[in-house]
């Protein structure tokens, strides 16, 4: 995204605040970030205060569809999975509306492979039942079709990071286990 201190970024899906804090600290950007999660809003609000970043980060508790204004850059990390197939058009129309002319956007999310996509839409699998209830993962081709048909956005770069996901999960698991050991009460 070539972030600079002149950028005002809109982040759709705050998560636990990692991106907003990183961008503010490392690049000096202004970030407006939104979540609909009470727990994440409370956690990130406290984090922003502790880090002294109230002047750089604006935290909203709003649905992304109600956002206004235009921004230099747009980021959405691991949120598109929650949007669902039926709302992808609206999601990208909203992204297009929020970006200034020549603005840049980075979306990172889990997609479904093309070969099984039609069946995926009609079935309930492990991911739809336990990970993202009520949603559907989307396919890259579907995203590209929606962008081309309904927005003025264009694809600049696409990267498949599948090969890194297993390693990421392993690192998360090890970190989780370390935290369990750290927080476990000592034996008596």
Regions found by a protein language model. Name each.
Residues 6-13:
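Conserved class I S-adenosyl-L-methionine
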Residues 18-27:
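Conserved SAM-binding loop of SAM-dependent methyltransferases across substrates and taxa
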Residues 65-74:
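A short acidic, Gly/Pro-enriched loop at the edge of an enzyme's catalytic core
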Residues 89-101:
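A short glycine-rich, Lys/Arg-flanked "PGG" loop and its adjoining helix->strand segment in the class I
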Residues 102-109:
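Conserved beta-strand signature within the Rossmann-like core of class I S-adenosyl-L-methionine
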Residues 116-133:
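Short, glycine-/aromatic-enriched active-site segment of Class I SAM-dependent methyltransferases
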Residues 136-151:
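Short alpha-helix
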Residues 182-187:
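Conserved small/polar residues in nucleotide/adenosyl-binding loops
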């Amino acid at each position: 995204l070539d972030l600079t201190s002149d950028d005002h970024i809109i982040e759709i899906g705050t998560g636990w605040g990692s991106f907003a804090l990183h961008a503010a600290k490392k690049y000096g950007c202004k970030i407006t970030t939104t979540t609909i999660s009470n727990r994440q809003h409370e956690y990130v609000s406290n984090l922003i205060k502790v880090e002294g970043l109230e002047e750089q980060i604006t935290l909203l508790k709003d649905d992304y569809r109600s956002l206004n204004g235009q921004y230099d850059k747009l980021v959405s990390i691991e949120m598109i999975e929650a949007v669902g197939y039926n709302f992808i058009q609206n999601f990208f129309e909203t992204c297009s509306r929020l970006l200034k002319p020549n603005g840049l956007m980075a979306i990172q999310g889990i997609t479904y492979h093309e070969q099984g996509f039609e069946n995926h839409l009609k079935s309930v699998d492990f991911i739809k039942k336990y990970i993202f209830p009520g949603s559907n993962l989307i396919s890259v081709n579907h995203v590209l079709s929606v962008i081309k048909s309904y927005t003025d956005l264009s694809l600049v770069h696409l990267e498949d990071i599948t090969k890194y996901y297993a390693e990421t999960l392993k690192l998360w698991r090890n970190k989780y286990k370390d935290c369990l050991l750290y927080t476990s009460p000592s034996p008596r």
